[in-house]
A protein has these predicted regions:
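Histidine-rich, glycine-flanked metal-binding segment
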Residues: 1-27
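Conserved beta-strand scaffold positions in the cores of enzyme catalytic domains, especially
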Residues: 17-21, 134, 364
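Di-metal (Zn2+ and/or Mg2+/Mn2+) metal-binding site signature of metallo-dependent hydrolases
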Residues: 25-47
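Flexible glycine-/small-residue-enriched beta->alpha junction loops
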Residues: 43-69
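Active-site-adjacent C-terminal substructures of enzyme catalytic domains
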Residues: 204-205, 213-332, 344-350, 356-358, ...
Length: 373
């Protein structure tokens, strides 16, 4: 972006510039989806019925479902298969006004399969006019084969630290490392070790933090200077204060809690009132948030998190960029920023969160190149 101003001023300054008629629509910065799990094989629609019958997320996981189901499926697929499945998903994401997308690995949980997932993300970046931000999530779960003798969880953690992270860093396959810090998954101490190794290898860090139970993960994110702490539906008051006193962005995922049928959403207003920076994201994944519709997440941010439309828009642009370490590059319509734009067929910004479930995106651009039209 070289200039922002009134039509008359810009027409005088740039008389030969190519013009695009927005036909009275609303132009926003391209939406920044800072938390997705777009590299997977089959959907997990059967789990929705299991939850409706009364099973919890952790009970389904304990039966070999959840993340473990996606792991079995991804391991059986080739890189080419995963690429072919992910490509139309990312195009659908762009069709809803998103121009920057964080994409995680995490359904491999083995060296070759995690590398395979990250290489798919690299191929997707070459094939799509979007900005993809790759994240290594080898610590998404403890794989089933390390939950019983002769193998142990400590051996898997050693594999992540000693083999996965060095390979990911050496091949420059990821910008971030992430971990699921949650009771029953990774402890705070285990998370500190793994994230410390990732940082030492040159990766920035993120956390899945305090999603289902307060575990001190938000406090750990603040302690380590993580770029973001995500989920936070069960964050403690102490965790809120810790994030508010830090530079870590609190990324909230209201679509996940809605789809899981959980009444308790992240305490967005308390986080804002304490001074934390709030981002929102889709958490697009096959089990707990199968949506690419970012404007729907804005609707949920307003109706469920009690954000204003202005706050939700900020959370999906400026703060979404900050949650990816891109605050100086994208998320704003200002000189010097990348020309990442989304055009919506609405007459008022407040309509962006009003027509819930309806896609009003007419076109989107990343760095001036069309993502969707």
């Amino acid at each position: 972006i070289v200039a922002v101003g009134t039509q008359s001023t810009l027409e005088l300054a740039y008389p030969t510039a190519h013009r695009i008629d927005c036909d009275g629509g609303v132009l926003t910065p391209g939406l920044v989806d800072s938390h997705t799990h777009a590299i997977f094989g089959k959907p997990r629609f059967e789990e929705q019925e299991l939850r409706a019958s009364g099973l919890t997320y952790m009970e389904i996981a304990a039966q070999g479902g959840g993340i473990h189901s996606s792991v079995r499926d991804l391991r059986a697929r080739s890189e080419d298969e995963l690429f072919a499945l992910a490509l139309p998903r990312l195009r659908r994401i762009a069709a809803h006004g998103t121009t920057t997308v964080e994409v995680k690995s995490g359904y491999g949980l083995a060296l070759d399969d995690e590398l395979k997932s990250l290489r798919v993300i690299r191929r997707l970046q070459s094939a799509l006019p979007m900005r993809l931000v790759p994240t290594f999530l080898g610590a998404h779960e403890i794989p089933l084969e390390y939950r019983a003798a002769p193998r142990t969880r400590d051996e898997y953690i050693a594999l992540v630290i000693d083999e996965m992270i060095p390979r990911v860093a050496a091949e420059q396959l990821a910008r971030f490392a992430d971990i699921f810090c949650e009771p029953g998954v990774y402890t705070v101490d285990e998370s500190r070790r793994i994230l410390g190794a990732a940082r030492a290898a040159g990766l920035a860090i993120k956390l899945h933090a305090d999603e289902l139970e307060p575990a001190g993960a938000a406090e750990l994110a603040a302690e380590l200077g993580a770029t973001s702490a995500d989920h936070l539906a069960a964050i403690s008051d102490h965790g809120i204060r810790a994030l508010a006193a830090s530079e870590t962005v609190a990324t909230l995922l209201p679509g996940t809690m809605l789809f899981l049928g959980r009444a308790k959403q992240a305490p967005a207003r308390a986080l804002i009132e304490q001074g934390a920076a709030i981002a929102i994201a889709t958490d697009f994944n096959p089990g707990t948030s199968p949506t690419v519709n970012f404007p729907l997440i804005l609707t949920l941010a307003v109706s469920q998190l009690r954000l204003s439309v202005a706050e939700a828009t900020l959370a999906s642009t400026v703060n979404g960029a900050a949650a990816l370490g891109l605050a100086a590059e994208t998320g704003q319509l200002a000189p010097g920023f990348s020309a990442d734009l989304a055009l919506f067929e609405i007459g008022d910004l407040r309509e962006l969160a009003y027509w819930y479930g309806d896609n009003r995106c007419k076109a989107s651009w990343m760095a001036g190149n069309a993502c969707h039209s």
